[in-house]
Amino acid sequence: MKDELESIDAAGAVLLWRASEYYPERRAQIDDTPACITARGNLHLLTQPMIAIVGARNASINAQRHVHNIASELGKHGYIIVSGMACGIDAEAHCRALDTGTIGVIAGGIDIVCRPENADLFEEVASRGLLLAEMPPATKPTPKHFSIRNRVIASLAVGVVVAEAAHRSGSLITAREAATRGSDVMAVPGSLLDPRSDGCKQLIHHGATLLQNEADVIECVSRQPAVRIPPEQFEWTDSMRQTIDQTAVGRCAKN
C-alpha cells in the first residue's frame, strides 16, 4: 500500500476514500463500488452535476458535430462532461468541455496513457479538468478494465448520452449500467444506413430518450423530478445482454 501511495503522489494524484469530502456522492450510494478511487486534477468538479457523453471511436462527422453542440450547451448549463478518454466521441466531448469542466475516466492506472494519440488530451484534462482511475498506478488496461471504466462513468453521471454506437460498442455497457442505476439514458439516432448508429437505435427502441438536438438533452435532464428509465422498463433481451457483455472480452478494448 505504501508503494501504491508513493506512485499516486509521484503522478500528482490523490487517493479518494469513500468517506472523503470529494468522493462522488452518487458513487458512494452504490454498495459494490470500491472504497477508493484515484484522482488527478480539479476535485471540485466531483461536487457538480455530471452528464456522460460516450460513443464510437471511428465517429462520423455528424456525430462529432452533435457532440460539439451537446457538450457546449451542457457546459453552459453547469453540467460537467464525463467520458472515457478514448478517440472519437470521447475525445470530442472532452475537448469541447475543457473550458466548462470535464472528467476523464481512465481504464488503466492514473499514470498510464492508454492511447498515444491522446497523450496531449490526457495532460489537458489533468491540468484543466479531472482524471479518475479505479485501477492502481502502473496498471496497463486489459479488455476487462474498459468494461470497468464504463461502469465507473455510469456511476458518476445523472444521465448518459450515447452519441454514436455500433451493435457491439462498449458504450452500450455504459448505457446498461446507467439504466440499472435509474439514470437518464439518451441516444442520437444517426443515419439509418450507418452501422455505427445501430447500437443507438437499439437503445431508443428499448426506451432511451431520442435526441434530435442539444435542447433535447437539457429538457431531459432538467425535468423536476427527473424522469428516469427504471431498470424493469429498460427491456434488454438476452441477445442484447450477450452481445454487450462480449465487448468486455472482445472489441471493448478498442473503445
Descriptions of predicted regions:
Residues 6-255:
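Glycine-biased, small-residue-rich flexible motifs in mid-sequence functional cores and linkers
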